[in-house]
Amino acid sequence: MNRRRFLTLGAVASGTLAVGGLSRMGSGPVAAQISAPPTVDRLVLTNVVDNLYDVFARGGRLDTVTVERTPLGKTPLLAEHGLAYHIDSSRGGERRQILLDFSLTDWSLFNNYRALGIDPYAADALVLSHGHMDHYGALPALATAGQGKWKPGVTVYAGGEDTFCHRVVVTPATTIDQGQLDRPALEAKGLKVHLVSQPAVISGQAFTSGQIARLTDFEKPPAAARLRAGDAGSACSATHFGLVKVETKPGDLVADNFQGEHATAFLVKDRGLVIITSCGHAGVINSVRQVQKATGIDKVHAVVGGFHLAPAPDEVVAKTVAAFKAINPDYILPAHCTGINTIMAVHRELPSKLIMPSTGTRVVFGA
């Protein structure tokens, strides 16, 4: 068994699956573009919290990427239905640290920061992918604990006003209240909040996708996702929810199009784009294409994060994998809400590209 296959099969073999020179694009209009996307020499991506923790997963060197696993220690890592990343990038002598998403509970996030030796208050910026509680859940507690500890002017970057709207999940069996992130409370605790609906550079080394264009015909927002309408004219009124143009009363539930969801990305020198979808409600392929358009760069080194395909029918999974083949990233690192169905499809169709992350996994891209 070659080294690549050894790493790819690590989590599968142990019985655990994580559910974790450049060319320019020359076609298609770009609504907004980063004129000179920053390049990093090295990028270290740590899954601080993910849906599973696989103590037996294998690590090692895989071509241009190093995969490091966290063994059992005195402070065991906690996994939950949530996602949080610590991102450490460098260019020359400049280092930047970014916190991306904040899991569901503060006890898992704080425990894992401690176990992994991460100081969250050393972060240069915070990025929130969207307004679901399994991504923002621990942010209020982190903001409270960080008063007086953050770097001056540290900012939370969100993709749109709907990040701070009340969300609900409605299924035939139950209704789940996702709650609402309190923006004024974050600001009162010393965090600035900045909305980036257009592609934007973060801390000089990262960048966000901006609002994600819906290009594919097979990627649709989850049917169960709802937003609770706010007062007319407010940031959470139904007319602000993207494709929704309906008359509603405050308190009504309307379809959630995830207008404010955004992806986070890096351009690794001589490798290409590393694109982190977080949850992928807008579509993992749409997210990748959005970053390609925003940067004008075609080459994708890695696609990382939750792809939100666990509940997807086989046809959608097959079309997603076919689109991955066309994009041809060097690596695919599915996490969080991707689903075993999609992980196995990638393993079957693109085995040489699959790396299985879980809670505590560190992946080093570049030098």
Q: What are the functions of these language-model segments?
A:
Residues M1, G21-V44:
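C-terminal segment of N-terminal export signals and the immediately downstream linker at the start
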Residues V44-V49, I98-D101, A206-I212, L273-C279:
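Active-site-proximal beta-strand elements of phosphoester/diester hydrolases
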Residues N51-D54, G59-L116, N257, E261-I276:
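Conserved beta-strand hairpin/beta-sheet module of binuclear metal-dependent hydrolase folds
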